[in-house]
């Protein structure tokens, strides 16, 4: 008997959609190319003692009554899957030469802190922060208006969204006349987008910046527990996930997708899976290439013409015999830059592959929870994240493996040098474990084209009302992916839940 929903891929949006449908007594089958579920949200084990999440660090939308919380409540998971909040008085600590700023959820306090740093620009700072707050409120109104929007019935505040539809963050910084240093402090969480201010959609920045202002969180029992809990809902409701199954083709009869051809990565055999509905969690462009773009409508073909987001460089580390609290670490992230010009810094790292003065994020999740520690007792996880060019690393790996390894070591050493100079003297003496991941690592383990981290690039061109959504123009097939919804933890939860609402008529967010 065919399942009601055959889902291709087990990324976070697919698991949310699958869990909601399974809970609604629909038969759900998921085929996954990897050996673990979760996509970028999966947790990997290295050796006997170390566990790291591939890409997730801190998340938003998890507070009482917020979107993730409402979805978990609908699944009866809100008491099982809980979250610890980062310090609301300063969940992101921004560091640059001569300045530091603790980002707070209180906009008035944020205005005060910035004004103390830049007293001559108090008026401009206030106007900018209040405008960000207003646009955030407009997004809430826009979302509450539902799926079928009537622009003439939207609250007046929501119409303010359209003013900045084509703007980058840099455009709006310039409109409000913020000093360069203030711009850098406010945009220093750029690794959350892997874009600098002069390319990043202002709307994308507002959604994430204010999302974290409303509460930055880390799962009490780590991200692995979140993924496993969603899987458990699916399996307890007669659903299943079949691993090591790579989708290689879609069978289309006229305008209807009837089945998916997969390659079993264990035995090398091809199999055919069918379902009453096909949910495509894999990259939409990749799926369209398999189907044949000529079979899709002109409108969908146009929406599929997106660039991928940049990729990243990750260093997963553990330290011992040190109290990180004494060195300024705690229930917050640290974002560092050695230059006040993030646009130029990004260009230098991403296009010139020069990491001599990098900007990067430092995450210490161990301060948020002591539950089921993922490292040996007495050690602390510390992770470093920055941007990296997929084409550059792919070419290095294919042509000169030693040069590829040397470049990864060079980037890590550059970041550690900065950590020792600015934050933790003798950091290397306390380093108990380290492993790095490059864009090709992302591609190999998460099956993401060009090692992309967020699906389509988060520029104004892609963050607009013409953005790709669940529609494929084919019968019985729907997209459910970061590129057809939104990226990140809260974004993919939202994407899966929105598709569930569309197909079930059961509104939960």
Regions of interest found by a model, annotated:
Residues 63, 158-168, 211-232, 244, ...:
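Short beta-strand to alpha-helix junction loop
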Residues 322-437:
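C-terminal segments that line or cap access tunnels to active or ligand-binding sites in enzymes
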Residues 2-134:
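N-terminal glycine-rich phosphate/pyrophosphate-binding loop and immediately adjacent elements
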Residues 183-193, 357-363, 421-486:
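A glycine-rich dinucleotide-binding beta-alpha-beta segment and adjacent secondary-structure elements
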């Amino acid at each position: 008997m065919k399942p009601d929903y055959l889902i291709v891929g087990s990324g976070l949006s697919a698991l949310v959609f699958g869990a909601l449908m399974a809970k609604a007594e629909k038969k759900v089958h998921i085929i996954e190319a990897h050996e673990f579920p979760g996509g970028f949200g999966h947790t990997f084990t290295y050796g006997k003692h170390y566990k790291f999440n591939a890409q997730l660090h801190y998340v938003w939308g998890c507070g009482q009554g917020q979107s993730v919380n409402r979805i978990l409540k609908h699944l009866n998971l809100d008491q099982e899957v809980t979250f610890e909040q980062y310090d609301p008085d300063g969940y992101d600590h921004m560091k640059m030469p001569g300045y530091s700023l603790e980002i707070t959820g209180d906009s008035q306090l944020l205005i005060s802190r910035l004004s103390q740093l830049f007293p001559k620009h108090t008026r401009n700072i206030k106007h900018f922060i209040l405008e960000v707050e207003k646009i955030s409120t407009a997004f809430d109104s826009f979302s509450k208006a539902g799926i079928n929007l009537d622009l003439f019935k939207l609250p007046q505040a929501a119409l303010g969204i359209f003013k900045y539809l084509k703007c980058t963050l840099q455009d709006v910084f310039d409109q409000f006349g913020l000093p360069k240093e203030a711009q850098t402090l406010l945009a220093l969480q750029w690794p959350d987008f892997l874009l600098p201010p002069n390319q990043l959609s202002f709307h994308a920045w507002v959604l994430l910046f204010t999302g974290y202002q409303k509460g930055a969180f880390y799962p009490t029992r780590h991200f692995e527990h979140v993924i496993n809990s969603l899987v458990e809902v699916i399996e307890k409701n007669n659903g299943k996930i079949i691993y090591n199954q790579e989708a290689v083709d879609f069978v289309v009869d006229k305008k209807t997708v009837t089945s998916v051809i997969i390659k079993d990565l264990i035995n090398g055999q091809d199999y055919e899976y069918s379902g009453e509905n096909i949910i495509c969690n894999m990259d939409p462009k990749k799926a369209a290439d398999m189907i044949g773009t000529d079979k899709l409508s002109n409108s969908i073909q146009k929406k599929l013409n997106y660039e991928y987001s940049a990729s990243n460089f990750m260093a997963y580390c553990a330290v011992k015999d040190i109290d990180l609290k004494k060195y300024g670490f705690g229930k917050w992230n640290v974002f560092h830059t050695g230059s006040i010009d993030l646009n130029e810094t990004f260009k230098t790292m991403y296009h010139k592959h020069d990491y001599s003065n990098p900007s990067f994020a430092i995450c210490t999740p161990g301060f948020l929870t002591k539950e089921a520690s993922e490292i040996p007792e007495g050690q602390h996880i510390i992770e470093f994240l920055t941007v990296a060019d997929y084409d550059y690393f792919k070419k290095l790996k294919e042509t000169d493996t030693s040069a590829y390894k040397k470049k990864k070591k060079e980037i890590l050493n550059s970041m550690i040098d900065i950590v020792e100079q600015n934050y933790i003297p003798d950091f290397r003496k306390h380093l108990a474990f380290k492993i790095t991941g490059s864009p090709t690592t992302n591609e190999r383990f998460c099956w993401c084209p060009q090692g992309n981290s967020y699906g389509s690039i988060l520029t104004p061109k892609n963050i607009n009302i013409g953005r790709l959504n669940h529609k494929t123009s084919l019968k019985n097939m729907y997209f459910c992916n970061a590129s057809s919804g939104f990226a990140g933890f809260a974004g993919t939860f939202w994407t899966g839940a929105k598709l569930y609402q569309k197909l079930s008529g059961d509104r939960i967010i």
